[in-house]
């Protein structure tokens, strides 16, 4: 959705949020009657197209400042955690659900956990874990080939979720759950789906009814939390026992839990923090990565010329490994994934057009200014990611699916970048594209998500 050119005040006098344009609303409830949690991003994007890059909306008693101008959005992201923190409801909800980890942590808790989780998910560790991704990708390929041979309909979205659950469980605690081997719904996946939906519902609720009048759905969510929580605690206990018996695992961790437990005593995470971080990884990887891959496939299906070029790239990457390994439909060397620039561009273009986290909500901690507007502490600020990423000032043909825009060669020809740049888009466009966030709290799972997506697409296309 394209938004109009921004109307940013040039006067030196700051205005208050109450003076911002916006959709108005009814007494007491504001625009709550128009609010649908599952469509929140579309509703807010529609208002951004009408009212510009900064506006105010009231939902019930709560006013929210909504921004979609890249530099202001980056200001919010870069000033975390001192200047802005997640929505004030996030940590209480995550803590009571036993999910309090890096995602919900703030201040000193976040500073202590961040380097540990980042190290566990960095390219060096993922290179050691890459065979796990290869195995899961081979299983997905075999499942789809068998379905094709038998003429069985494939539920692509469900299988991609199984795939990401399998990869995440193996990476997180060395357990091969192999949900891809099942045709019926997997119990673990069902519990994770219920928890994921429960988080979204509770964070979007204006009244915490689950605390004093729990519904049947609330009780089912709590049951799923207990079941998965008990399993995760068992994995933690087992990982500790393994490391006591095999000290080498401190230097050569076999999965994420080993890497987290290898921290020295001064940095060590509590069981609750370990539990929260492992649960967060399970939930984050299950939904976001699978949706990105599904959107990429959907967009490719409507562009046969791009599909053909991507297929050629995948076949060439597999052929380059032919001399070092047996013929395989799956890339077996992590370095080979670097030879997939167009496929990576397809993933990035899917994230640009269909971001899996299209908005983020924050609470101001300190007084600041955004686009000439005074932001007081405790002000709720929402950033919208799709409007700037589909703005013609940042991306040519912004509504078109053009993965080649991310390639350095086209950027040089179009004047958007240079042939020597690692990304084919200009600096301004890169600032407008933030699917993994930005600033100090840049998503630690970015590399893993891109790696999984490239592996699945390369295998499927070849």
Residue ranges and their predicted role:
Residues 33, 38-46, 86-87, 267-276, ...:
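Cytochrome P450 heme-binding Cys-pocket and its upstream "meander" loop
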Residues 164, 168, 224, 228-233, ...:
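Central I-helix of cytochrome P450 enzymes
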């Amino acid at each position: 959705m394209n938004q109009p050119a921004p109307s940013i005040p040039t006067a030196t006098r700051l205005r208050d949020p109450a003076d911002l344009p916006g959709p108005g609303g009814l007494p007491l409830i504001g625009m709550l009657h128009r609010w649908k949690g599952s469509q929140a991003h579309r509703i807010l994007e529609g208002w951004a197209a009408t009212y510009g890059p900064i506006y105010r909306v009231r939902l019930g008693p709560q006013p929210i400042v909504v921004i979609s101008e890249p530099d202001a959005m980056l200001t919010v992201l870069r000033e975390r955690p001192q200047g802005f923190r997640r929505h004030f409801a996030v940590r209480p909800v995550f803590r009571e659900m036993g999910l309090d980890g890096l995602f919900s942590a703030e201040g000193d808790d976040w500073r202590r956990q961040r380097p540990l989780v980042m190290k566990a998910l960095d390219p060096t560790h993922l290179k050691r874990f890459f065979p796990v991704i290869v195995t899961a990708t081979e299983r997905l390929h075999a499942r789809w080939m068998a379905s094709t041979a038998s003429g069985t309909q494939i539920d692509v979205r469900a299988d991609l979720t199984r795939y990401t659950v399998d990869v995440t469980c193996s990476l997180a605690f060395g357990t091969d759950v192999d949900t891809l081997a099942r045709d019926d719904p997997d119990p673990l996946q069902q519990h994770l789906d219920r928890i994921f939906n429960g988080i979204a519902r509770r964070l979007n609720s204006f009244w915490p009814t689950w605390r004093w009048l729990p519904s049947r759905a609330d009780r089912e969510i709590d049951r799923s939390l207990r079941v998965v929580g008990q399993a995760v605690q068992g994995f933690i206990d087992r990982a500790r026992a393994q490391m006591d018996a095999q000290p080498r695992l401190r230097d050569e961790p076999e999965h994420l839990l080993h890497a987290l437990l290898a921290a020295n005593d001064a940095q060590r995470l509590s069981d609750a923090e370990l539990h929260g971080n492992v649960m967060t990884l399970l939930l984050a990887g299950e939904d976001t990565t699978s949706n990105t891959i599904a959107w990429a496939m959907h967009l490719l299906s409507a562009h046969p010329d791009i599909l053909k070029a991507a297929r050629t790239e995948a076949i060439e990457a597999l052929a380059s490994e032919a001399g070092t390994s047996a013929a395989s439909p799956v890339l077996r060397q992590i370095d080979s994934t670097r030879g997939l620039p167009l496929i990576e561009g397809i993933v990035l273009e899917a994230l640009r057009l269909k971001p899996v986290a299209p908005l983020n909500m924050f609470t101001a901690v300190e007084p600041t200014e955004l686009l000439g507007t005074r932001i007081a502490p405790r002000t709720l600020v929402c950033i919208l990611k799709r409007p700037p990423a589909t703005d013609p000032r940042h991306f040519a043909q912004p509504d078109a699916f053009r993965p080649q825009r991310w390639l350095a060669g086209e950027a040089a020809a179009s004047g958007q970048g240079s042939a020597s740049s690692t990304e084919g888009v200009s600096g301004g466009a890169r600032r407008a594209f933030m699917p993994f966030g930005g600033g100090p709290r840049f998503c630690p799972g970015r590399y893993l998500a891109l790696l999984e997506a490239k592996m699945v697409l390369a295998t499927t296309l070849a």
